[in-house]
Curated annotation (Swiss-Prot):
The keyword Disulfide bond applies. Cu cation 3 binds at H129, H422, H470. Its main location: secreted. Lignin degradation and detoxification of lignin-derived products. This is Laccase-2. InterPro entries: Cu-oxidase-like_N, Cu-oxidase_2nd, Cu-oxidase_C, Cu-oxidase_fam, Cu_oxidase_CS, Cu_oxidase_Cu_BS, Cupredoxin. It holds the Pfam family Cu-oxidase. It is an enzyme of class 1 (oxidoreductase). It comes from Agaricus bisporus. The gene is lcc2. Disulfide bonds join C103-C509, C135-C229. Cu cation 1 binds at H82, H420. Residues 21-145, 157-305, 375-488 form the Plastocyanin-like domain.
């Protein structure tokens, strides 16, 4: 026993020594890019799309100065950035959603995001969380590596070359699309789909597809991220099986599949065994969401990349897609079986039903109310003493939940909405395509689609903060499809889980409120 305790102490010391603070400088700029061959103005990090890949190790802290150099009067010039999938324990103010966790950062200023990834590892991403700004380009991948990954024996290669982003792309600027959306009530249709920032549209130039290089005999962990504003993708690689192992930064029992649906904001890790003849193979991610009849530029089947074996000629593949087994919710079981709070079918401490309706298109209601952003961030109101819904303005869509409680959320089916919960993972105890509850080993993730069926998930309130729950179709969020959980309000103010509030965060609201509307 003494040896065991000493070993644990030494391991903890080694882990502490290895932990580091990693700094990534983000220059937020307007530049003209043509990821699908059509040149347009963009809002991007460091002049590139997708944005800079952030790579750290489990236990590290992150420091990201954001230098807002936006100048274009045709797009939003203020900004906020969400670090999607991170719990932000004690740093709810760094989570990013505008008017939930912070005021937006004005142009010609620098704001530094600082947070610890603590015990988290896996596949994450980041994006603007101000209006629909990320549809203009502010989105990128974020990976936290675990040197002691319990599933690490399944793969040989896991680095920047195996991070794969899936996105849709618009030729029209997001503010203009917003105006069209709110005047017509019709969701905008994208012009093209991109893999790793490259794609094509009907009638456009034959821009080169992205190439993912592999070597025969090696196993590759592909971290596939849907950095989309609306559609979902069906990911596959011709002539190759895939082994699913991670969903939304949570590792699951390995399952052999041929393809997987990945909804907006979801992340999936799959292992590809490069065991086929040396050649070129299509990597496919056809989109669902957006009617091509309403945009002649769109060809959903042109969301392609090339898997190229070492030694293969530099030509496009001639392989053919053969549909196979698609990953099912019922096959997804986290390797850490313990869920949030109480396992088993015992009653939750609090049950919430969210009824979605759209009586006044394009606006959405939840329980009869459409979400409207407050002028003072919800978190700041909590830190100022708000303890009840009536203490928060506006109060209608703020749900106060007590600490250390099991919360069950039920969403009856209504349309296709990938819901994302900030600050937590949740257990999907009733999937939208099932009629049987699973309280033993349900899928665990932070984004799940409500696809016309009854969906129920559970989470445990062990992380005080202000946490958004919203549809990750950006146009639906803009139309009010959201609520906010105000978790353990008093514990945000004082105690061991109280919020860390840097001065530059406190300065954001006065700075933002002082600028003219055209700069907001």
């Amino acid at each position: 026993m003494r040896f065991s305790n000493a070993f644990v102490l030494v391991a903890a010391c080694i882990s502490s020594v290895l932990a580091d603070t990693k700094t990534f400088n983000f220059d937020l700029v307007n530049t003209r890019l043509a990821p699908d061959g059509f040149e347009r103005d963009t809002v991007v990090i460091n002049g590139e799309f997708p944005g800079t890949l952030v790579q750290v190790n489990k236990g590290d802290s992150v420091r990201i100065p954001v230098n807002n150099k936006l100048t274009s009067s045709t797009m939003r010039r203020s900004v906020s950035i969400h670090w999607h999938g991170f719990f932000q324990a004690r740093t709810s103010g760094q989570d990013g959603p505008a008017f939930v966790n912070q005021c937006p950062q004005p142009p010609n200023t620098t704001f530094t995001y600082e947070f610890s990834v603590a015990d988290e590892s896996g596949t994450f991403w980041y994006h603007s969380h101000l209006s629909t700004q990320y549809c203009d380009g502010l989105r990128g991948a974020f990976v936290v590596y675990d040197p002691e990954d319990p599933l690490g024996h399944l793969y040989d290669v896991d680095d920047e070359t195996t991070v794969i982003t899936l996105a849709e792309w618009y030729h029209v600027l997001a503010p203009d699309i917003n105006n069209e959306f709110f005047s017509s009530g019709i969701i905008p249709v994208q012009d093209s789909g991109l893999i790793n920032g490259k794609g094509r549209f009907n009638g456009g130039p034959e821009t080169p597809f992205a190439v993912v290089n592999v070597e025969q005999g090696k196993r590759y962990r592909f971290r596939v991220i849907a950095i989309s504003c609306r559609p979902f993708f069906t990911f596959s690689v011709d002539n190759h099986n895939l082994t699913f192992m991670e969903a939304d930064s949570v590792e699951h029992d390995p399952v052999e599949i041929q393809n997987v649906d990945i909804y907006a904001a979801q992340r999936v890790s799959v292992i590809l065994n490069a065991n086929q003849p040396v050649d070129n193979y299509w990597m496919r991610a056809p989109m669902t969401g957006g009617n091509p009849d309403r945009n002649p530029n769109l060809n959903i089947s042109l969301t392609l990349a090339i898997l190229r074996y070492k030694g293969a000629p530099e030509v496009e593949p001639t392989t053919v897609n053969v549909p196979g087994h698609k990953l099912l919710d019922q096959e997804m079981h986290p390797i850490a079986q313990e869920g949030p709070g109480k396992l088993g079918d015992g009653p939750p401490d609090k049950h919430i039903t969210l009824n979605i309706a759209q009586p006044n298109a394009p606006f959405f209601d939840i329980n009869g109310i459409s979400y409207i952003s407050p002028t003072v961030p919800v978190l700041l109101q909590i830190l100022s003493g708000a303890k009840r819904p009536e203490d928060v303005l506006p109060s209608e869509q703020i749900f106060f939940v007590p600490k250390n409680s099991l919360i069950e959320v039920n969403i009856p089916g209504e349309g296709a909405h990938p819901f994302h919960l900030h600050g937590h993972n949740f257990d999907v105890v009733l999937a939208s395509n099932d009629d049987t509850f699973n309280f033993v080993n349900p899928p665990r993730r932070d984004v799940y689609p409500i696809n016309g069926g009854n969906t129920t998930f559970r989470f445990f309130t062990d992380n005080p903060g202000a946490w958004f729950l919203h549809c990750h179709i950006d146009w639906h969020l803009e139309a009010g499809l959201a609520i906010v959980f105000a978790e353990a309000p008093e514990d945000n103010v004082s105690g061991p889980q109280s919020q860390i509030t840097p001065q530059d965060w406190l300065d954001l609201c006065p700075e933002y409120n002082a600028i003219e509307p055209e700069f907001q």
